[in-house]
Structure formats: C-alpha cells, structure tokens
UniProtKB/Swiss-Prot annotation:
GO BP terms in the entry: symbiont-mediated suppression of host cytoplasmic pattern recognition receptor signaling pathway via inhibition of IRF3 activity
CC terms in the record's Gene Ontology section: host cell cytoplasm; virion component
Keyword Nucleotidyltransferase annotated: no
Keyword Nucleus: no
Taxonomic lineage from the root: Viruses, Varidnaviria, Bamfordvirae, Nucleocytoviricota, Pokkesviricetes
Domain of life of the source: Viruses
Identification of the protein by name: Minor capsid protein M1249L
Keywords: Host cytoplasm, Host-virus interaction, Inhibition of host innate immune response by virus, Inhibition of host IRF3 by virus, Inhibition of host RLR pathway by virus, Late protein, Viral immunoevasion, Virion
Family assignment from sequence similarity: Belongs to the asfivirus M1249L family.
Length: 1249
C-alpha cells in the first residue's frame, strides 16, 4: 500500500513552519517532494501543491508586503467577515479533541497567493495539538485555526498579514491562456501559476488606467460597434495595449480581450458564492459606471437565473418573517390577556416551564403552553379577547380620520412653535375636555387620539421649561418604574400608565457613593463639563484601570455647583464664553485635586500626567495645567478682552481652594481587573460564536448556565481553560496595558474610522491615498506590538522612530490643509470652498432624451443579432424579461430600441432636433393649460362632470392628464379656450402686480436734509487718538481690500474718491454704520427682548429689569438725519457721501464714549462703543493683503514660524491685544506665570488642616 503523507507530517514537525527561514523551508520542501514525486495517489499530488503554496505564502508574508498594490480590505474587516462566513461550518468535538469542518452544498473556491488549494477530507491537519479535518483549506479556515486553536500571538500576526495579502488576489481566478488565444481567437479559462501572475499584472494596469479618468472612449467603443470598428494606432486605443501585454497589437483585438476579461470577471461573480460577500471593488466600479451593460448577453444567463432564484427565496423569507411576526404578536397578547384576566401566578408558571425547556423565545410553544395550562372556558376567554383586539387593530388600520395626519405631523415636528400650532388643531377634535386620566378620544371616529402626557409635554417644550420642571409635572402620569443595569450603572425608567411611553430616565452610579445624573439634556453646561472632562483623559495617566465615565460624572457633580455659585453665573441654557471658561478652570482644578490626593495616598492609586514623573512637585503640575488650559481653550479666552493670564491663574488658585475645602481628598474606585477581563471575553463575538457551535454539537447544554458550576464548565469547554487558569497571567495583561503603544485620542478615533471601513476604488480623480496611508500606520503599530511581545528593548527604539514618522505625517497633513484653504478660499463668503470634486459634463443632443413628440425615451426593447450569418432569424427583438427564454449563445446584444417611438439607440442623432424642441414646448403649454383648467371651468365656476364630461365646456376627464391618446380632442379643446386662458392668466397676473406695486414717487431725487452738512476732520482725529491708531485707518474703512496694512496706515495707495452712487465703498461704509446703529438700538431697547443678542446681554446681565427699561430713557438717539443726508449725498455727491458716513460713525462713537451720567451707564456705553468700532476695523483688516494683518486673530495655529514679517507693521509672531495695532511686544512665553504668586508652599497650605 502506497504511503500517504499527511499534512500533520508537513506542518507539525516539532516546530512552527512559519518560524523557519527560506533555506530551512526549501530543505523541507525537497525532503517531502523527494518522498512524494513518484507517487500516483491524487492525495499526495494535492499535498505537493499545498507544500509549494505554503512556501510561497510564507515568503509573501515576510518579504513582499510592501511591493504589492494596496487593494486589500483592512485586516479587522477581514476578520469580521470570518464570523459571518457560511461556506464552512466548524464543529467542535470535545471527546475527540479535533475540529471537523462540514462543507456546505455551495461551490467553494479559495486561494492562497493566487493558487487553488484542495486538501482531502481524510488528511488530518495537526497544529499545536489541534487536529483539523478540512474539505477545503482557505484563508478563512486558516484564520479560524488561529483564533479557535492555540496559535501564538506572533504566528497570528503573520497569518493576519498573509490573509491581508491574499485577499485581493482572490479575483485573479480567471485568466487568458495566450497560446490558445492566438490559435482559436478566444479565451480559455486556466489556473496555472504563471498565467495568474501575468493576469495579475494586467489587472493592476487596468486598475491604474481606470483611476486615471481617461476611459470614456472605452465605453463608446463597447456600446456602439464593439469589435467591428477599426481604430487608428494614433487613437487612444494605444492605452489598452499596455494593459493586455507589453507588445503592441491590433486595437480591436485589445477590445476583444477587455470584453473577455469583463465577461469572465462578472461570470465568476455570478457562479461563485464566495464572491457574494467578497471584495470586488473593480467590478463594483465598472457596474456603477454602466460598463457592464455591454455584457448583457446570453453569457449572463447564469447570473439572471441566480438573481431570479435569490429573488424567489427572498419573497419566501419575507412571507415566513411576516408569519413569524404574526404568531409572535399573538403569543405576546395571549400572555398579556392571561395576566389581566386570570392572574400572574399562572403566567409565571408557564414562563418558568418554557425557560427550563429552552423554548421561551418560541411563539408556537408559548401558544401551546397557554392553551394547555388553561381550562376550556379560560381558553375560550383568551381566544375571544384576542380576536376582539385583532378586529380593533384592523379597524384602526382602515381608519382614514383626519386626526391621523395631524398626530403624525405633531410627532414629526422640528420646532416647538409648529408643534404647538398643530396641538391646537388636535384639541378641537377631543371628545372630552381637560382629560388627564385616560386617552383623549377623537369625536369624529371614536378611536384613541392623543395621550394627555403628550399634550402636556408639547406645552412644556414650547415654553422652554427646564428638565426638572418637565420631569416633575410628567411624573403624575407615571405608573411603571423599571430598573435595569448597564455599563454605566442602574437606569431607572419611568413609563406613562396610560399609553406606556417612556417619560424620563436617569442613571445612578452603583460603583461609588456619588450620584452621576447625566439625563438633563437641556443643561448645556452640564454636558460641556462632562465632555471637556472626557477630553482631559487624553493627558492623564491613572496607573490602573479606571472607569473614565465615573471620572467625568464626579467632575460634573463637583464642578457644576461651584460654577453656579459664582456671581453673575445663572442656570440658563445659553451660556457665554465667560461661563465656559469658569467651567474649564474648575475642571482643571478638580484634576489637580485628584493628583494632589493620589500623592497623599500613593498605595491606592497613582494619578499623574503623561510624560511627568509621579513624584513631580505640585508647582510643576500647576504650570502644566495652566499652559494646557490656555493653549487648549485659546478660542474662548480670545473672545473675552478683559481676561489676562494673571486673571486665569488667580481664579485657578481660588477654584483649587474651593474644591479642597468642600470636597476634601478625592479618589476614584479602581475597576476589578478580573471582572473586566471576564466581561470582555464573554461579550466577545468570537466567544459567542464558539459557544453557539458547542451548543449545536452537544458539548454544552442548550440553555444559558444557571449556576456557577455550569458557567465554569461552559467557559472551560469554549476557551479550553478555567477562568482561574486564564487569570493567572494577570501580570502579563497588566504589562501589556501599561506599556504598549496607544495613539492619542484624535489619532485613535481617526484610525478606528478607517479600521472598520470597507475600502472602495474610485474612478474619479483623487483616489484614497490618505486612507491608505492611515491604514498602513495602523498595521505598522500592530506589527510593533507583536514585536514588543518578543523583545521589549528593540520595540522601544522602533517605537520612537515610528512616532517620529507619525508626527511628521501629521504635520504634513496640517500644512496641506492650510495650503488647500488658501488655494480655494472664497473672499465673498469668507470661508473655504467646499466643492472639491471635479466633474466633467458631456454635451448631448436633446433627442437622446426625448422623441419628436416630446416624450421621454424608454429603452426597454433589446435587439439581438446572430453571431453566425447563417443563423435564422438574423435579428431578434425581445424585452428584458424574455431574454432568458428566447436568447441563447448564438445571439449577441447589438442595440436597444425605444418602446415609445420605436427608434434605435444609435439613431437618436438622426431625429429632428427642432421638432423635438417644438414638441417639448407644446407639451409644456398643454400641461400648463390643462393644469389651469383641472378644476375651474372656462364657462365660469367649477366643472360639472357627468359621464366623465363637463356639461358646460365639454372637457373629458381622461384628456386632462393624457394628451396623446386623443390628440384631436386635446387640440380642439385647447384652440376653443386658448384666448379665454390668456385673458384669465393676464387678469390674475395684473391683480398680483397691483398688490405688489406701490405708489410711485413724484420726486426725481431724495429730499435734501434740513441743515446743510460740512465735513469736520477733527472728529476722525479725536476718534483715532482714543483708539490709538492712525486716522488714515479710519478713513480707509470700506477701501482696505487688496492693500497692505502698512500702506493703509500711512494713507498710501488709497483709491480715488467715488464718482458713482453704486461704488462698493459707499455700500461697505453704510453697512458698517447700520450695524453700529442696530447693535446700539438693541442695547437701548434690551428690555423688549425675550432673548437679547449675546454681546448685548453680556453688557447688561448685572442690571435689574427696571434699569434695563431705563436705558431707553437715559441713552441718546444718535440716528438723527443720517439716512436722509446719506441718500441725498449718495445721489448728488458720492465722494461727500463716503466722508459723511465715516464722520457720522466717529460722531456716534464719540457721543457714546463721552457720556458722563448716569454713572451706572458710563462703563456699559463706553465698552459698547469701543468694542463695536474695533470690531468694524478688525473686519476691514481681513480684506487687506494676506500676511499684512495679524493672523493671531484666528488663533495660534495659523501663525507660520520662520516667515519674515519685518516689512509689515503687524508681526505674525505677536499676540493679539485689545486695541490699537494688535501688538503687544512680549518676547517671553505668553503662557508664563512667573509673575503669578502660585508657589508650592502656598498650594501645600491649601489642604484642610
């Protein structure tokens, strides 16, 4: 008997084959091959094939990864696919300690590095003591061996990378045998390794060609004459020669090969179930671009048959699902009726029986148990009640009452004001008024209309009531209180006792004594503190596993009352930047207190900052937190002109004092590592998958474990070891957690998005280079982690190098983003243009869309021609549904025919375009005419239809919408009433014009002012002196665009005075004046606003309501005759109009700035005047030349280091000031606190005695 060598003898030879070098692998190959080369047994031949494939697999994993194109899906997405793959079904057998793989009935094709691999079912594979019996050996199976078996982490890393490489080669199953092609002129499907390599090269070239965007000619050739048209060598057909092979051949033969390639690719997708969930980006892109339409011929019969079969199966599944839903609903209702009519004792007994038998989710079993447990009368009672309920449901389904539309509109309203209006309409339909105990019934249909709690909820939301108020008032409807636990704690949900809808919920942290209520969604400040605390976790090092949500919840409970206790801070939904800054200060003070507390109790938990030693001084932590705060929240700080570094440091010190004295030393509860690890394992999808297989196999019971002993048995059966044995490596897991590389928060979020995202090719310009680079960063990080497990010192050095490249990549992205901002910056809108994709529009004659009667084409008739001239009939025309029945391999798709006008698709250019345009115009006129007389009658009033005809005007109902079936009737009716239609249309239009028209003015120009105006340059000088700027800057308002700020300050390069009333400078200055006056009037009449603008509210928030009312009396009216004078000068003397507007702006500023009494108004008005005028000037500076103004107004990130700004009077290195030239000559660190009295001794004395 001939010896058969098993896979176990090849793979499991006392060592891991993946750890061998190339020489050792080749020696192993020679040894096994010399034993098998004389064998005739088909099993040994397959093993030889497997051996060479395994060698290529290892070599590719080690050396070829960087050379292959990035066409593979991300590794995580590939692993996720394994969990849902149904081509092989693993069955775990505990008794025999082996994994049998039951093949499915569908066809299975798997590849490793492009080569088929079929392992006989009799050949067991032994990997690390685990015997496997496989029908087909595939990357999917190999990954399952790695995860379900006992592979080491190092081996798993190589396997994952190998599967990543082989994934994109799965599409190269079909290729063209060149020799057979030249002899027979057609392709032959082969699977030799050499052809696969050649086909791989062709595929990559085609992929690059499609991404280049120059492929529009290809579809024209394929869709028109295909292989019958001769192409010149100078034509773009030369591109395709580089795709098929290096030597130049006839273009029409190239097209034949491309057609063959596309056919084989689509056929492979149709007949192979592997590719239904595979990675086929090129085929998807070709299909989306419409290229596969040229392949709609008999070759696709298998595809159509599969599609039809899948559609039938889907319909059957839908019917089964509907039946299942119906039975499930019936079972639930039976239980509910039993509890209401008979009692819960009997229903609980039935539920317990079903749970013991594992049938609690089986609706048929529920129905049988309910009927069996009840007597005859009780069963009839339940059945009758259910039939009544079902009948009521059917009546409700058929109900067409008007209240249904109103209720739907109420529930889907986007604004509270709109919902309140709809609610008023609903209340009219209430059968009873002031009902708060039962459903409000509709007096029209008698069905349930609206629950009273919804009525009250809409009113409270429209009144902008707080969350606490809403919860208090809605609690009177609460009748059900359910409690459940999740990873955040205990959730208490309250439900309406009338309709069962959820009213409110809140979360109680069960892991600490502190209450963490994050349910108040209307409190923006509460959410702000929670979010900013979570962001701070990126630079805090806890040392042990800590619940960061608990950390944020405690921060909310500690900081929120302290922020609200500050004077002038109120509990309102809209909070200003000052309130946000106070919240940030208290958050960072809370973090400092945690660090201070951990230093006092080091045995429990050590909290520090990343990059700082745990025993660092408290002064060092204070310096870091202050710098971090000023850098992270510079946008908020820059909005507050009165805030200084000293102010922030002083308030930070006071906040730290309050937190220490009110909360004392604080600590966080450390999570139980054992509990966390076991929870993660039990919730892992792979564990659930393996447990399900074990239940099917009978290794563990079908029901969930009910005792600790059963739970431990299940865990050991699935994992292979007990929890105690698994947790014995706790120190190893701690070491991984504390030492392995973890990206920062933003980078991690970015990588996760790419990590779980399916990559897809794009045929438009741009591609996916950024995602490719980010994916490589992730894979490199994963590879470094595997190396860490082997050699930690080398890992640390490689990690430092990797992080250097990662940071450089981030800086490169930032520079590219800034460059793109300036390249596509739109000065009209003040922001970057969002239109980044390029589209190319193709001009087509209108006859390609419409025929000569103005009707759109419908290409629903397929024209097939015989491939052989001797075939009869030579041409067949069929519809799409008849293709399978009437078309065979002897016919090919030649053209399409329109079912409306019966013209062929390639003949649309021969249609008369003028006729098409005339018909479209007439069709539009007919549509407008008959829409106008759809209900109104030209004889007066409405139509009086009898027997589908108006007895007054003779209009038939069927020609209102159909203008083609009876063209004579359509034209006759149109000609009879065309004049009447024109008169009525003009009459309606004239009435509308009269409504919109106003009485024309008899004056030819604006009325002159009562007092003549003379220019006073002293007002401009006085204003410039207060603002500490050059008078020329004020004169340049409206004329700074395109000028450097140095020229503006010196008064150089100013444009000539305006000579036209439409000069844009007049509109710019007039707009500035109007904005100043509008904001001033908002300040004067602030008492009339329910919600004044934020900048106005900030100025008057300390005033009482009576004082706000008095502002209108004590503040002067500065408008006077501005509008009259400006309109007059704009028409008569545009140059004077410009000077007048600038002078009026200065006069208004001086009038407010020089107010002396009453004293409580002086500071408000002065601050308003300074802020408004500085804002106008700052806005004008934005229009000056780039680099000529202070980019610090955008924040520190916009300042480019290294740029010479010595020629500009505003340095790009300076920090923004309050007034003047925005220059503060400060060369030291702007975040320095060297002049702030915060020392270690002072902070140490802050602790409670």
């Amino acid at each position: 008997m001939e010896e058969v060598i098993t896979i176990a003898q090849i793979v499991h030879r006392g060592t891991d084959i993946l750890s061998l070098n190339n020489e050792e692998i080749e020696a192993l190959v020679d040894e096994i091959y010399s034993t098998l080369k004389g064998s005739n047994d088909i099993k040994n031949i397959r093993l030889i094939d497997f051996l060479f494939t395994l060698k290529d697999f290892v070599n590719h994993v080690r050396a070829e990864q960087s050379k292959l194109p990035d066409l593979s899906m991300p590794m995580e997405a590939y692993i996720r696919q394994l969990l849902v793959d149904s081509d092989v079904v693993p069955i775990v057998s505990e008794k025999k300690k082996e994994l049998r793989v039951r093949p499915s009935t569908r066809k299975e094709i798997f590849l490793i590095n492009g080569t088929h691999l079929a392992v006989p079912a009799e050949a067991p594979i032994e990997i690390y003591g685990l015997k496997l019996r496989l029908k087909t050996f595939s990357p999917q199976c190999f990954m399952r061996m790695a995860e379900i078996g006992s592979f080491s982490p190092e081996t798993l890393g190589y396997v994952a990378s190998g599967a990543n490489l082989t994934n994109f080669i799965r599409v190269f199953m079909k290729c063209v045998d060149q020799e057979t092609w030249k002899k027979n002129g057609e392709g032959v499907v082969v699977t030799t390794k050499e052809n696969i390599i050649q086909f791989t090269h062709q595929y990559i070239e085609l992929y690059k060609f499609l991404r280049s965007g120059g492929h529009s000619w290809l579809i024209n050739r394929l869709a028109e004459e295909m292989v019958h048209r001769k192409l010149d060598r100078e034509d773009q057909g030369s591109h395709i020669s580089n795709i098929v092979e290096t030597e130049e051949i006839e273009p029409e033969e190239n097209i034949k090969r491309v057609i063959f390639f596309l056919k084989e690719l689509s056929t492979m997708y149709s007949v192979s179930p592997v590719f239904t969930s595979g990675y086929m980006p090129l085929l998807y892109d070709l299909y989306r671009a419409g290229y596969l339409e040229v392949l709609w011929n008999p070759v696709e019969q298998k595809f159509l048959q599969h599609a039809e079969q899948r559609e039938k199966e889907q319909m059957i599944l839908q019917q089964v699902d509907m039946k299942l839903m119906e039975v499930t609903t019936q079972a639930r209702q039976y239980f509910k009726i039993m509890e209401e009519k008979i009692g819960r004792v009997q229903s609980d007994a039935i539920r317990e029986i079903l749970t013991m038998e594992g049938k609690v989710d089986d609706p048929n079993s529920i129905l049988q148990e309910v009927i069996k447990a009840c007597g005859k009368q009780e069963a009839e009672l339940i059945t009758t009640e259910y039939l009544n309920i079902k009948k009521q449901w059917e009546l409700q389904e058929k109900n067409a009452c008007a209240h249904l539309k109103l209720v739907k509109q109420l529930r889907s309203g986007l604004q509270y004001a709109e919902s309140l209006k709809v609610l008023e309409s609903i209340r009219v339909l209430y059968k009873e008024k002031n009902n708060t105990t039962n459903w409000n019934l509709c007096k029209a249909c008698g069905f349930k209309l609206l629950c009273p709690h919804v009525d009250m909820l809409i009113q409270l939301q429209a009144a902008e009531a707080s969350y606490d108020t809403m919860r208090t008032k809605l609690m009177k409807f609460s009748g059900i209180n359910k409690e459940k636990e999740n990873n955040q704690g205990l959730i208490y949900s309250y439900f309406c006792k009338i309709c069962g809808e959820e009213l409110a919920h809140f979360i109680q942290e069960d892991r600490t004594a502190d209450v963490g209520v994050i349910g108040d969604l209307n409190s923006k400040l509460r959410i702000f503190i929670w979010q900013e605390t979570m962001k701070a976790c990126t630079f805090i090092h806890f040392g042990k596993l800590v619940d960061v949500k608990q950390f944020a919840n405690i921060a909310v409970n500690v900081c929120l009352p302290l922020v609200y206790s500050i004077e002038n801070i109120k509990k309102e939904e809209d909070y200003d930047p000052l309130t946000q800054l106070y919240a940030v200060i208290y958050i960072y003070a809370y973090i400092l207190n945690l660090i201070y507390s951990s230093q006092k109790n080091k045995e429990f938990l050590t909290i520090t900052i990343h990059g700082m030693k745990a025993d660092s001084s408290l002064n060092a932590y204070v310096t870091f937190l202050l710098e971090k705060m000023m850098q992270q929240y510079s946008g908020i700080i820059n909005q507050l002109s009165e805030i200084t570094d000293q102010w922030i440091a002083n308030n930070f010190r006071e906040a730290f004092k309050k937190i220490i004295h009110q909360n004392g030393l604080q600590g966080l509860s450390v999570q139980d590592d054992t509990k966390v690890l076991l929870t993660e394992i039990l919730l892992d999808p792979l564990y659930d998958y393996a447990a399900t297989v074990a239940r099917i196999d009978g290794s563990i019971p079908m029901y969930k474990p009910r005792t600790p002993k059963e739970a431990e048995y299940e865990f050991k059966t699935v994992i292979g070891r007990t929890p105690a044995e698994l947790l014995s490596q706790k120190e190893f897991y701690d070491k991984i957690y504390t030492s392995k590389y973890r990206p920062d928060f933003t980078q991690l979020a970015r990588l996760k998005d790419i990590y779980f995202q399916e990559e897809s090719l794009r045929v438009w310009w741009g591609g996916r280079d950024e995602e490719k680079t980010s994916t490589l960063i992730y894979l490199r990080a994963y590879e470094l982690f595997l190396k860490y497990l082997q050699n930690a010192p080398n890992f640390n050095s490689e990690l430092a190098e990797f992080k250097t490249y990662e940071n450089a990549y981030g800086e490169q992205k930032a520079l590219l983003a800034q460059q793109g901002f300036y390249n596509i910056f739109d000065p009209n809108t003040g922001r970057a243009d969002q239109r980044t994709r390029l589209f190319e529009y193709k001009r087509l004659p209108i006859s390609t869309l419409y025929d000569e009667r103005g009707l759109p084409h419908k290409w629903t008739i397929y024209v097939y021609k015989a491939v052989d001239s001797s075939q009869k009939p030579a041409e067949i025309e069929v519809t799409r549904k008849d293709v399978i029945k009437k078309i065979d391999d002897h016919y090919a798709l030649a053209d399409l025919r329109c079912s409306v006008c019966h013209v062929l698709q390639h003949e649309v250019g021969q249609l008369n375009i003028k006729k098409v345009q005339t018909a479209l115009k007439a069709s539009l006129e007919f549509n407008t005419f008959y829409a106008f007389y759809e209900s109104r009658c030209p004889k007066g009033g409405l139509h009086d239809f009898q027997d589908k005809k108006c007895v007054k005007c003779g209009l038939f109902t069927y020609i209102i919408y159909d203008h083609l079936s009876q063209p004579e009737l359509v034209h006759d009716y149109y000609n009879n009433y065309k004049d009447q239609y024109d008169k009525e249309k003009m009459s309606i239009r004239s009435i509308q014009i009269k409504k919109d028209m106003t009485t024309p003015s008899t004056e030819t120009q604006p009325k002159p002012p009562q007092e003549p105006w003379t220019f006073d340059y002293g007002k401009i000088i006085k204003t410039a002196k207060i603002l500490d700027i050059s008078p020329a800057v004020i004169e340049a308002i409206g004329a700074m665009e395109g000028r450097s700020y140095a020229d503006i300050r010196e008064g150089q390069g100013a444009p000539p005075p305006p000579t036209s009333m439409d000069d844009p400078r007049l509109m710019a200055v007039d707009s500035a004046v109007r904005i100043f006056l509008y904001n001033y009037n908002c300040l004067r009449h602030v008492s009339t606003f329910n919600k004044p603008p934020m900048h106005v509210e900030r100025l008057v928030k300390h005033l009482s309501y009576e004082e706000k009312e008095d502002l209108e009396k004590v503040l002067p009216n500065v408008v006077n005759e501005y509008h009259t004078t400006f309109k007059h000068l704009r028409v008569t003397d545009p140059a004077s109009a410009l000077l007048y507007s600038i002078e009026f702006l200065c006069i208004s500023f001086l009038t407010l700035y020089e107010i002396k009494e009453p004293s409580w108004v002086v500071n408000i008005v002065r601050e308003f005047a300074l802020t408004e005028l500085n804002t106008i000037i700052q806005s004008e500076k934005l229009l000056s030349k780039p680099g000529a103004f202070n980019f610090m107004i955008f924040g520190e990130d916009f300042v480019c280091s290294g740029e010479d700004s010595s020629m500009d009077d505003i340095s790009a290195y300076s920090s923004p000031g309050l007034f003047g030239e925005d220059i503060i000559d400060r060369l030291d660190d702007p975040f320095s606190i060297e002049d702030v009295d915060i020392s270690l001794d002072v902070l140490d004395n802050l602790a409670p005695q």
